[in-house]
């Protein structure tokens, strides 16, 4: 078991030897040499958000709320493409926007969650896709409601430091209060919801705050056991964002953080988005990642539209170059496919 002080020493140390020692440890553990991915369809239900993060291009004041028929059309096409995950995403607390609320009301819905529930239920009944929702902070009761129609859910912790709430990254984002995010991840644990979370590297956090964030995720998982994967995501600069001129984390920073995440989190899968790491993703296989996350043959990454997905053949090719077998998975990991973790109708659908 690696301690916080040992982790900090590792991040600060500039010699290659500690890295090589940790790599040997990781590669000894990962005897299966398997890396997974989920073939998905990314459905941006609505791109308004109450948060205005310094690194985000997803949010738009002139928002678009997808119509029910538009979402069904995407899902039908995704089914033809063989996708198994429907990633439903929208900005946090979109109901705070009166214009969004009015549009939903005209369509006969009391709010965005009722709208989401209906399309998720339709997805389960009419396609081979399984819903996975990531829409910001939700209450215990809201999580319980959506559990009925989701195979898994997600929320990035990003960082456990309250200090970042007063920085350019999160000063206009009340939903990025780490206490709110930790509470939601814990509530998902109480409700037995298979969960994806992660950390964001390069938004002004210190090395200590990176380590604290990973240990916080470990604490939650040891208590509830619901965290199926952790994303180690690198900040990427984009034109016309407040953080446009911020320095991106170096490949070595990412490499070290992936190594630590794998050693600290042990049996939790570690994911790095391949579209944000096209030049370095292959090297991160050696650092301990065992999942590429969602990759879509149909839709773009609406959060990072400038970064196209690699095609599955490309993923397979550079996974094999390092001796890794690429394996498709569902949005819920195999060890969570059980009555304890899934609503009955979702479990039955998976087992068919």
From Swiss-Prot:
CDD domains: Radical_SAM. [4Fe-4S] cluster binds at residues 49, 53, 56. Residues 35-275 form the Radical SAM core domain. It comes from the Archaea. The keyword Lyase applies. Keywords: 4Fe-4S, Iron, Iron-sulfur, Lyase, Metal-binding, S-adenosyl-L-methionine. PANTHER family: 7,8-DIDEMETHYL-8-HYDROXY-5-DEAZARIBOFLAVIN SYNTHASE, FO SYNTHASE (COFH). Catalyzes the radical-mediated synthesis of 7,8-didemethyl-8-hydroxy-5-deazariboflavin from 5-amino-5-(4-hydroxybenzyl)-6-(D-ribitylimino)-5,6-dihydrouracil. Belongs to the radical SAM superfamily. CofG family. NCBIfam families: F420_cofG (TIGR03550), PRK06245.1 (NF004884). This is 7,8-didemethyl-8-hydroxy-5-deazariboflavin synthase. The gene is cofG.
């Amino acid at each position: 078991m690696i301690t916080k002080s040992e982790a900090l020493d590792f991040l600060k140390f500039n010699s290659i030897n500690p890295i090589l020692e940790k790599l040997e440890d990781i590669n000894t553990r990962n005897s299966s040499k398997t890396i997974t991915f989920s073939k998905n369809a990314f459905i941006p239900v609505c791109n308004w958000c109450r948060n205005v993060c310094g690194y985000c291009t997803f949010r738009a004041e002139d928002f678009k709320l997808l119509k029910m028929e538009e979402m069904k059309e995407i899902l039908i096409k995704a089914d033809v493409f063989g996708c198994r995950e429907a990633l439903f995403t929208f900005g946090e607390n979109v109901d705070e926007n009166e214009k969004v609320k009015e549009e939903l009301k005209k369509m006969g819905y009391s709010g965005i969650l009722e709208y989401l529930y209906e399309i998720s239920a339709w997805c389960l009944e009419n396609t081979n896709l399984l819903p996975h929702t990531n829409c910001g902070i939700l209450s215990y009761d809201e999580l319980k409601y959506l559990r009925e129609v989701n195979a898994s859910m997600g929320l990035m912790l990003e960082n456990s430091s309250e200090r970042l709430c007063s920085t350019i990254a999160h000063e206009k984002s009340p939903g990025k209060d780490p206490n709110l995010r930790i509470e939601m991840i814990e509530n998902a644990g109480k409700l037995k919801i298979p969960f994806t979370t992660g950390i964001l590297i390069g938004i002004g956090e210190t090395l200590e705050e990176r380590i604290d964030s990973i240990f916080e995720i470990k604490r939650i998982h040891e208590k509830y056991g619901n965290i199926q994967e952790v994303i180690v995501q690198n900040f990427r600069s984009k034109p016309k964002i407040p953080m446009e001129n911020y320095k991106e984390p170096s490949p070595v920073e990412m490499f070290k953080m992936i190594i630590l995440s794998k050693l600290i989190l042990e049996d939790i899968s570690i994911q790095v988005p391949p579209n944000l790491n096209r030049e370095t993703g292959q090297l991160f296989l050696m650092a301990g990642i065992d999942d590429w996350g969602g990759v879509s043959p149909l839709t773009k990454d609406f959060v990072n539209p400038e970064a196209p997905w690699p095609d599955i053949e490309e993923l397979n090719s550079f996974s094999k170059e390092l001796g890794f077998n690429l394996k498709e998975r569902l949005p819920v990991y195999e060890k969570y496919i059980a009555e304890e973790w899934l609503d009955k109708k979702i479990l039955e659908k998976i087992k068919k």
